Amino acid sequence: CTYAENFLHILGAEKITPLMTRIMDATLVLHGEHTINASTFTAMVTSSTLANASQVVASAIGSLSGPLHGGANEKVIAMLQKIESKEEIRPWLDETLKAKNVVWGMGHREYSVKDPRANILTDMVQELFEEREGGVTDIFEKAIELEKACEEKLSHKGVYPNVDFYSGILYKEMDIPTDIFTPIFAMSRVSGWLAHWIEQIQDNKIFRPTQNYVGSDDRAYICLLYTSPSPRDGQI
């Protein structure tokens, strides 16, 4: 029993096929490491203080908890579920772009082309549907249509699907609860975080960036006693 297969058993999957195991294993590998993102950088900074491995992972998870880093594949699913049909994709995209709202799962700071990890996951989604012989689902059809529409409107800006766009669909089709998506990401990224921990402590120098102050030169000190409301005044 592999690590990926055992995890699917723990989640309570009723029928685990070799393809499902391969997909889970592939997603863990694809998410294992991907340059210096926020959580990895946090892990590196914590490592530089000579904190132990558990503390390094804990700090990275803290960074991952922020909405701008983790949870994008969960938001992709919620976004696609709100769109009634694939025919509504283009009108929805026009309204979203006009309002300058986020199209979740689109664009990546490191790529001006489709995320290579997303290409692998797209093929795996199709393999999963072929194995089940039930045709593609409504949510996958909407995802394909949205990718086409975004390519027409956003490719000139280098905006294409990233790894989160299809990973959530894969997990959903394997009946994995949405609120487990980000913990799965953390589970896979632990290997990358700890690889950076090992690398850091082998030739360590504590992170200490220089900060240039650009405020006023002289400022008056104001005692907080005279600026904060007193609890006894009932003004908390």
Where would I find each of the regions flagged by the language model?
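Accessory "access/gating" subregions that flank catalytic or transport cores
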Residues: 1-55, 63, 78-158
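Conserved phosphate/anionic-ligand binding catalytic regions in large, soluble enzymes, centered on
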Residues: 49-77, 103-112, 160-196
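Short alpha-helical linear motifs
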Residues: 65-68, 100-103, 204-212
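Short, well-ordered loop/turn and helix-capping segments at boundaries between secondary-structure elements
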Residues: 78-86, 127-131, 176, 186, ...
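Short glycine/threonine-rich loop-to-helix capping motif typified by GTGT followed
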Residues: 117, 172, 176-177, 219-222
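C-terminal auxiliary extensions adjacent to catalytic cores
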Residues: 201-225
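Conserved small/polar residues in nucleotide/adenosyl-binding loops
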Residues: 226-231, 235
